Amino acid sequence: MSYYFKNIKPGVESESDEGEDLERLLRRNNQDDADESSDDELRTLSFGSLKKADTMMKKEEDGDRKLNRKIKDKPSKQVKYESEQESAPEQESESESGSSDSEFFEEESSKKNGDQKKKKKRSKHAPAEQSAKKRVSKVREIPGLHLSKSQNPNLYQDIRFDKSTGGPTDSSVIRRRYGFLDEYRQKEIEEMESILHDRKLTSKLPPEEVESIERRLKSTKSRLQTMKSKDLEQNIVKDYEQTMNKDNKNKFHLKRSERRKLVQKWKFEHMKSKQREKVMERKRKKRLGKEFKQFEFNK
């Protein structure tokens, strides 16, 4: 008895249902026969043919992997171009609205790629770039002229005292030639002091301008004081050297350390009593501080 006749059950099934069941059974039998035949064929194959098939499969897999790597390494634009070429026959069949949408999205993607390229970090060894719209400054840098750190290259400088014009300049000669400028500086100081003392005038002026006048007054006073102190030191040293070189054939010149001591001695002798007391007190405190430091180290 076959499988079909064993599983027949009494019921109210139509003839069409019975026909469908028969077709299913026949299909199953055919599939079982095909599987058995394929198993028999594999059993008959030799080991050499199986090895050849295995090597062929491995080669195909390696080729697929290389293609995938190449596709990944390619730039995004090239991949898009190739994909567009492959999908060209399919896009021809699509409507015009679809093509317009794709163009719109392509434009957006190209813009994004352009922005990403701009944002990329430049190499530090790349040449410097500058816009052509930027104006060239009127004050140019002279190559080979090295200014000291204290001097600001942006400030205006008198060409008569510029290093690029010639050899080294003697400060004493310049001071002797342009000593009359001290009178103008003194007049400026007096004018600024009169402006600051006048309350009516300062109330009318803005606070920023008043602050700038105060700063300028302070700087001019300090500049004038330093110039006068330098002149005094030069005169003291000059007088001392003249007295020493009266009878001597060889000229005698003081060292820097000796000059400093001579100037300090002269200033101390020409001080008032109160000023001397202040100087002595300051020196005493300084000496005590040094002694305390020495005691701490010895501990």
Curated annotation (Swiss-Prot):
Residues 1-172 are annotated as: Disordered. This is rRNA biogenesis protein RRP36. Its main location: nucleus. InterPro entries: RRP36 (IPR009292). Keywords: Coiled coil, Nucleus, Ribonucleoprotein, Ribosome biogenesis, rRNA processing. One of its GO terms (cellular component) is 90S preribosome. Component of the 90S pre-ribosome involved in the maturation of rRNAs. Required for early cleavages of the pre-RNAs in the 40S ribosomal subunit maturation pathway. It comes from Zygosaccharomyces rouxii (strain ATCC 2623 / CBS 732 / NBRC 1130 / NCYC 568 / NRRL Y-229). Residues 22-31, 51-66, 73-83 have a biased composition (Basic and acidic residues). It is found in: Nucleus, Nucleolus. Residues 208-230 form a coiled coil. The keyword Ribonucleoprotein applies. Belongs to the RRP36 family.
